[in-house]
């Protein structure tokens, strides 16, 4: 550090430090300070005498147990003798016995709660059944999938068009069909309307003369991609449409029909 930044400070030896101004002070706890606080009294445990315990009786096999029961108790059930014997637990049979020993049918509530494992029709009744075509499924998810996809009765609930008599299964298909009646896509040049935006875009190219889809094999170009796809079949080596009379092959079905209508010249 440079000398110019050092500050010389004189030490005053006559000034003594004042220790009473320190922040922390040591506190000495004296035992005489606890005299003003009462100490809690802890109760002593009570010592029981030998007379408080009842003597233990040891029974051996030679001495039978004939302890008298309290008055009013039955030796079999432990309940009051005036109440009679307690009825035994219900068995697995479908009938119970009354006090006279004769069989009596069980109640309707008990019969409904008991599982009918021996009856196979009872297990079939627990399956999930379609309320439209009465088909049964073992799980609820299978029934929901059936209603969504495979139920013929559900498929008959179609959506009908308000402009014509056509019906559709889904609401989305109906909305796409309604566009053929409303024709929301209108050409600004000639006023012709279309149902789809891409149809309008292909129509506008007929006004502008734009043909962005060109053939890589020849110099022809097309305004629509579908026309280019049909043109590329003429360059294909495999021509799958063959004439039955002269065995001539064509790349498109329309060309084959045109060939047959013009008159096929059969070679003799």
Swiss-Prot record:
SUPFAM superfamilies: beta-beta-alpha zinc fingers (SSF57667). It is found in: Nucleus; Cytoplasm. Pfam families: zf-C2H2. Residues 84-116 are annotated as: Disordered. GO terms for biological process: cartilage morphogenesis; cell migration involved in endocardial cushion formation; cellular response to epidermal growth factor stimulus; cellular response to fibroblast growth factor stimulus; cellular response to ionizing radiation; chromatin organization; desmosome disassembly; endothelial cell migration. GO terms for cellular component: chromatin; cytoplasm; nucleus. This is Zinc finger protein SNAI2. It comes from the Eukaryota. Repression activity depends on the C-terminal DNA-binding zinc fingers and on the N-terminal repression domain. Keywords: Cytoplasm, Developmental protein, DNA-binding, Metal-binding, Nucleus, Repeat, Repressor, Transcription, Transcription regulation, Ubl conjugation, Zinc, Zinc-finger. A zinc finger (C2H2-type) spans 128-150, 159-181, 185-207, 213-235, 241-264. Coiled coil: none annotated. InterPro entries: Snail/Krueppel_Znf, Znf_C2H2_sf, Znf_C2H2_type. Transmembrane segments: none annotated. It comes from Rattus norvegicus (Rat). Belongs to the snail C2H2-type zinc-finger protein family. Residues 1-20 are annotated as: SNAG domain. The keyword Transcription applies. The keyword Transcription applies.
